[in-house]
Structures are given as structure tokens and as C-alpha cells.
Amino acid sequence: MTNQESPKILVYTGLFPWENISKSRILSNDLIGGNTGNLLFSWSTLNIFSDVPHENFTKVYITLENQLINYEFDYFLLPLANTFRENNDEELIFLISLLKKISCKVLLNGIGGQFGKVGFHKFSNEQLIREFIELLIEKTTSIGVRDERTKEY
């Protein structure tokens, strides 16, 4: 049951800081996205809504089995860091599908990739990256980019 006076917030994360989940489940479901730095990044975005009760947050994550039944939210927090990379098609397809289903405000920060300073090769999933960015442009007023290369998208 959610608190009706506070916003309902969807968060792209494998787990919330207030959850008690076993290490084995965290690792077997890759709820940290490959490294614990992802948790620091995603959890820091929760501070924007520190006055919202925990029951108003819903998590969605590519490695979680549960599927959303209700797509009615006030905000979708989308903390991404290294989204632009090879072999990330599954996550991009998941996020594109989700973005098409929601109508709430999207708060995106830190999108990009780990690019070298000299030269840049095109990714094989360039079309998915562009589709993802085009959807984001429709859903948010600003996109926080990680670097100059990401800004080119």
C-alpha cells in the first residue's frame, strides 16, 4: 500500500538500500550490475526523494524476474553510467520497451560509456542506442551526459 500523499516512484535498480537481501541472491541475480559502484550511483539518486516513504518506491531491473503490472508512476529514476557499450542489447531493449509503457517524468543522470580519449568506433548496437536516446528526449527535459562523446548522440 502506497502513501497517497507522496509520489509513486519507479527506480531502475536491482535492490534498495533498505532491503535485506542475501549475498548469494545478490550475486546470482546480478543485482549490482557487475560492480558495487552501480549501487552507489543508483542509491545516490534516491536522495532526491528522501522524504518519500519506502513503500512508494518500486524497483525494476533487467535481471529481476518480476514484471510490472501497473505502469502508473509519477517519476522514473534512471541512473545509468555505462549504458553505451557492446553487448548491451538486452538492457537497451528492456529499457526501450519500458519507456514506451510509462507516461511519467523520467529523471536520467550520468548516461554514457567508457570511451578512450583518442578515436571512437561505432558500436554494433548503434541503432538501439539511438532509439533509446530518442525515447528519452521525448520523456525528459534534460539528459545528464558523462562525456563529450555521449553528447554527440
Q: How would you label these PLM feature ranges?
A:
Residues 2-142, 148-153:
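Aromatic- and Gly/Pro-rich donor/ligand-binding loops
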